[in-house]
Amino acid sequence: MHWADATSEKIMKKRNAEEYVVSSGITPSGHIHIGNARETLTADAVYKGMLKKGAEAKLIFIADDYDPLRKLYPFLPKEFEKYIGMPLSEIPCPQGCCKSYADHFLMPFLNSLEDLGVEITTHRANECYKAGMYNDAIITALENRLKIKELLDSYRKEPLADDWYPLNVVCEKCGKMHETKVINYNSEDKTITYVCKCGFENTVKPFNGIGKLPWRVDWPARWNIFGVTAEPMGKDHAASGGSYDTGIKIARQIFNYQAPEKMVYEWIQLKVGDKAMPMSSSSGVVFAVKDWTEICHPEVLRFLILKGKPTKHIDFDLKAISNLVDDYDELERKYFELIEKQKTEELNDNENEKISLYELVTPKIPERLPLQVAYRFCSIIAQIALDKETQKIDMERVFDILGRNGYNPAEFSEYDKSRLEKRLYMSKKWASDYGENLEINDLDQAKEQYETLSEEQKAWLKAFSKEVENIEIDANTIHELMYETATKLNLAPKEAFVASYKILLGKNYGPKLGSFLASLKKEFVIGRFNLTE
């Protein structure tokens, strides 16, 4: 059984609720990266597991856009220093293209969720507070101030100040919430008196966005407000004495609510060189979800995140993304094989889990096994078939190349062609930004490389080019011909390959050579190996 099915089953048995609400949330203080997406996709997987079992369930997302800007992040201009302490929803867009700072970072993520197959109801904290959804919780927190302080202090080395109040007020003059302090609460008329470092002081009702609960009180309050029954959380929140531990007690003793079941997830680390570093918007170590959808299929991101348990950390290497796509393609082939197999045989647990995983990570399952052209090969084809003036890929050239590599383009469905074209453009961008750009040497560069070769390699180049004149060029024929001609001249095949890569790319290595040469025009291959083109 896949972990998402097992988790949803466990939660349903424990809670036995009429309706389940699975929640996730993010503070849009910077670029929302694939590490953040792990929380939302984990929630989505468990939610889908509940639906599979016939349960009534909802999936919600809380955008914590009423949190303050905490510091001047490296990606912000110096002038944004004046906004530190203001709610993210009230700060202008750093590039002037969105309604607010929060929207600038939030909207690309929300827009990508549809591509990722996530259907979710979004609640923005700033709108919820301003609409009065937290008003009752604010009163409850203020009237139970000392009890909340006692609960929080039991987990703290240093107790909170005796005059602490569980409320952050947005100053009506300067708009900041990190420099205000509540100095009194009047339980009769439900007003608070606050002072701000800017010199402003006022007595107001702390409702409809005037006040915001601090995180350790806000979280259990929202569980109650939205009826949350399950929520993924990072290991920092789930640690002993963390905000989940205090949240359990505040939810039960202050808001009379049972805390949701926790689902702890590990970080996704971004591999930079030989080091793997935890992703963090504030540190600038990020790979945004919107960037993923430019270089790879959304279902492959779901596959990366959901194939293993959430408690397993993931090292993500951008240079190895082609291997990840290969693994997804292998799962896809296995899925359609097992769908046929189960018509006549009973599948074992491992086979059923493969079916569950593919269905979970693939939002739109094709009717039959679609065309699969390896991602790395697509990156090569895309660069060869690219019109440098228009930056468009010549699909007729692509079909010609594939025809010489064992494919039959006449059998491609419209779905196949559409998916192939997407993969070509995505893999081209990947090769350009993160992989290896395919830059074929010009003739002068090829001649320079030629002079570095042994006499045996030079003789082989001429013999090989002569033989190519007499064949119909395709990947297998080219591959066999390279071995045959090298063997005849007593040249190690490896040396023939090195000679080919050097006069083509100026390197000792390169893409799979048979497929690569079959992707080029026959006249060019003959001319290059003769050093005339």
UniProtKB/Swiss-Prot annotation:
Enzyme Commission number, as recorded: 6.1.1.6
Locus of motif 'KMSKS' region: 278-282
Keyword ATP-binding: yes
Gene Ontology, cellular component aspect: cytoplasm
Keyword vocabulary terms for this entry: Aminoacyl-tRNA synthetase, ATP-binding, Cytoplasm, Ligase, Nucleotide-binding, Protein biosynthesis
Organism name: Methanococcus maripaludis (strain DSM 14266 / JCM 13030 / NBRC 101832 / S2 / LL)
EC category name: ligase
Listed name of the protein: Lysine--tRNA ligase
One of the record's GO molecular function terms: tRNA binding
Miscellaneous note of the record: Able to charge E.coli tRNA(Lys) in vitro.
Sequence motif 'HIGH' region, location on chain: 28-36
InterPro entries according to UniProt: aa-tRNA-synth_I_codon-bd_sub2 (IPR020751), aa-tRNA-synth_I_CS (IPR001412), aa_tRNA-synth_I_cd-bd_sf (IPR008925), Lys-tRNA-ligase (IPR002904), Lys-tRNA-ligase_SC_fold (IPR042078), Rossmann-like_a/b/a_fold (IPR014729)
Catalytic reaction equation(s): tRNA(Lys) + L-lysine + ATP = L-lysyl-tRNA(Lys) + AMP + diphosphate
The gene coding this protein: lysS
